[in-house]
Structures are given as C-alpha cells and as structure tokens.
Design a protein with these regions (language model features):
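Proteins synthesized as precursors that undergo proteolytic processing into mature forms
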Residues: 92-128, 240-248
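A contiguous strand-loop segment
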Residues: 1-93, 126, 311-317, 322-324
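Short, surface-exposed beta-strand-loop junctions and turns on beta-sheet-rich folds
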Residues: 20-22, 81-83, 156-159, 166, ...
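Long, compositionally biased
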Residues: 135-159
Length: 324
C-alpha cells in the first residue's frame, strides 16, 4: 500500500510513500539523456529527457517506482491488486510493457498536454521484465505544475481520469475513491458550529473538531481521504525549506509504523521511504523508515548528457544531530 501526492508553492512538488514489508534494494537513479532504453514492442529510445527517481536496477535497467524528468513532469506507480489488467499486444497501438511505462512517458513528454496525447495512443501490456519478474499490478498518477491524471488499465479498458485532488492511493478504482470523498464534505479545518439541535447547548471541547470523522486507519480509501484533506487544506511558506518540510508533513499523515499493519505472521508493512521531488528544480528528496533526516540528490549536478545510469544508494542509518 502506498500514497502519492502533489503540492505547489512557487515550485511544484510531487512524491509518494512506498509502503511494503520488505525492500528490493531501492536506489536513487538518474537516467541521462543518452542512455538507450530498449522497449520490448516499440523499439529503442536512444535520446530522451533526463530522469531521476527511485528504482530497482536489474540488468542495468531502471525499474522506476516514482520519478520526474528534467522538464517537470512526474509520475508514480502504486499497487492496484485485483483491478489492474494488462491486455496482450494490440495492433495499431503503441504497446508498452507496464514496467516501461514510466520511462516511456517521462522520456518524451515535457508537459501534461503531451502526456495526454501519448496516452491516447498507448496500450499497456503485461509483458514481464524477466521470467522471475512478472508484471506488477499497478496504476499510475502523472502530474506537472498545472494538472494531474490517474491512469488505470482494467478489464474494461484504459481509464484516464482527471485528478483534481493530486492524490492517489490503491484500491478501489479512482472514480470510486473520488465518490467516497462525498462522505467527508462536512469536514473543515475550522471549529464546527452546533447544528445537532438548538435545544442542546453543545460545545467544542477540543481544537480540531472540524475534522471529526476523518478516518485514521491504514486502508487505502481512508488514506486517500486523509491525505487529500491534509494536502488541500495545507498552508506553508514558499521557500524551499518550508515547501519540502510541509510536503513531508503531508505524507506523514499516512505513513505506516511497524506493528500496525500485519500482512503475514510476524511480518508488517511499513513506510520504507517517502519521496519529495521538486519537479521545478530537479531535486529528489527522501527519508527512510530508519533515517528521518531529509536527503537530497540534484539531477542537475550530474552530467545529463551521459549514457550510463547514475546510482545513489539510500542512506538508511539514522543520522542524529547532537546539540551538546
């Protein structure tokens, strides 16, 4: 289970939590412009926009979980188990395997207008990366500074939803997630008035009672509502430090602690990492479950005209600044 969100001050920010019971050895990976992507059904992409994001690298190929390109378009793939369906290769379409979808989009789209044009021609297939690495059941959020969409490949076709919340979690499908927000239309960051009855002098006995009823569990529908409420009512300054800090606070509203979500006997889902991309400046920030310090990798401090992948391992050891 994972959560993704967008945020905008004077710059545009995008990120996600990756919630799972184990890591695949994730790294921050920069794919420079002249790295050659070998797509299974649509040939090679030898020159493209530079990309930075979190990935598992297999056979010198970046399997991105979330990423942004040098133009400010960002996207992430999140679990969509039970609903994701990837058809066979379809004639007349640009057939892209699900593991290729992120580089296919980010490699050639400079804005959401170009993303929409690309999506109109695409068929996302279930072609596996390798025999022992089948296609993951995913759906995607794609965004720039102006808008966001959710992309879901299901048995009844490819769905492309406008995403006015700039938020995505897992199941149910996105249109149902949006409908369920109707349950929370009465919530507010302000203190509520007594509308129960004029006959009862009911009072607010605590701050924060305007959001009474906001779900606090870890289910995907509840996380969707909680992070949407947090993000859409969020207030911060627009400096880099304030914006990045606020973004981590937004996703912090849905992070998972060890022991609270058991997935098997003695195994628990945790927030392995949280990312925050400044898509305007090309800076990838992250924290991990075991290291709360914010770490940054700036794509523009690398040679983006190169042809080889650039790797940075996640810094996992807790870093504590001692004041005395």
């Amino acid at each position: 289970m994972c959560t993704a969100a967008t945020y905008k001050t004077k710059d545009f920010y995008f990120g996600r939590t990756l919630d799972y019971e184990f890591s695949y050895g994730d790294q921050i990976v920069i794919t420079p412009c002249n790295y050659s992507f070998h797509f299974r059904h649509v040939g090679d992409m030898k020159n493209h926009y530079a990309i930075i994001g979190m990935a598992h690298v297999a056979e010198d190929y970046p399997l991105y979980y979330d990423a942004m390109n040098e133009k400010g378009v960002a996207m992430a793939g999140l679990n969509f188990v039970g609903n994701a369906y990837f058809p066979e290769v379809t004639e007349g379409k640009e057939n892209v395997a699900s593991f290729e979808f992120i580089p296919w989009v980010l490699g050639q789209c400079a804005n959401m207008k170009e993303v929409r044009e690309l999506l109109a021609k695409i068929n996302i297939t279930g072609t596996p990366f390798a025999e022992n690495m089948p296609a993951a059941s995913l759906h995607w959020i794609i965004a720039d500074a102006d808008e966001a969409v959710t992309v879901e490949s299901m048995k009844d076709g490819l769905k492309i939803y406008d995403n006015p919340t700039g938020v995505m979690t897992n199941n149910p499908p996105f249109d149902q997630q949006m409908f369920l927000l109707n349950n929370y239309r009465g919530l507010s960051p302000r203190q509520p008035e007594n509308r129960f009855s004029e006959k009862l002098p009911l009072e607010c006995y605590s701050r924060g009672m305007g959001a009474l009823g906001l779900p606090g569990d870890l289910s995907s529908a509840s996380r969707f509502a909680r992070v949407a409420f947090t993000k859409m009512n969020s207030v911060s300054g627009d400096s880099e430090e304030e914006s990045v800090g606020q973004f981590f606070h937004i996703l912090g509203s849905v992070e998972q602690q060890g022991g609270c979500c058991e997935v098997a006997e003695g195994k628990y889902e945790i927030t392995i990492y949280t990312s925050c991309c400044n898509a305007t400046k090309g800076i990838y920030y992250y924290t991990t479950y075991t290291n709360r310090q914010i770490t940054a990798v700036d794509m523009h401090r690398e040679d983006l005209d190169g042809s080889g992948l650039i790797h940075y391992p996640m810094l996992e050891k807790e870093q504590i600044l001692r004041q005395n």
